[in-house]
Amino acid sequence: MACSLDLSGVWSLKSSEWKEETIPANLPGDNYSALLAAGKIPDPHYGRNELAVQEFRRHDWEYSRDFDVPAELLGYEHVYLTAEMVDTFATVLINGKKVLSCENMFTRYRADVKAALRAGSNRIEIRFKSAENEAKKAAAEQPFP
C-alpha cells in the first residue's frame, strides 16, 4: 500500500536581500508571480516592466512551510520526496537536514527522507541559488581565457 502527502499550496518565500520579510507564494509556482501578487513588483509582462524586475534574478530565494506527518507514514520502510521542475540550483532541507540537491530543472528528483521526518509537525525548506550567479561562478572556474 502506498501513501502520499501533497505539499503543494501556500508556502513562505524569502529573498536573500530581505532581512526577515516573507511573502506568501504558491507551489507549484514561481517567484515573479508571488512578487506580483504581493505588490512587490509591477507586472513584468506589461510594457517595459521586465527591465524593472531584473535584479530579482540575482537573488537567492527560500521557500518554506510546515507540514504534518502522520505517525503511520513512518511505519513504511521508505518515505520518498519527489521533486519535479525545480529551477535550477536548489537544496532541500527537512527539519534542518539536507535531503536533496537539485541542479537541473528537467530532472525528476527522488530521495528517501524518512530519517529526516518525525511524527507531527515538520518543516521543509527549498533554498534556491541564483542561476545567473552560479553560472558566472562555473564560467570563472573554466581554464579558458
Q: Where are each of the predicted segments found?
A:
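Surface-exposed, low-complexity/disordered Ser/Thr/Gly/Pro/Asn-rich loops and linkers
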Residues: 44-54
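Short amphipathic alpha-helical segments, especially helix-boundary/capping motifs
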Residues: 39-43
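Accessory beta-strand-rich segments of carbohydrate-active enzymes
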Residues: 3-5, 9-18, 30-38, 53, ...
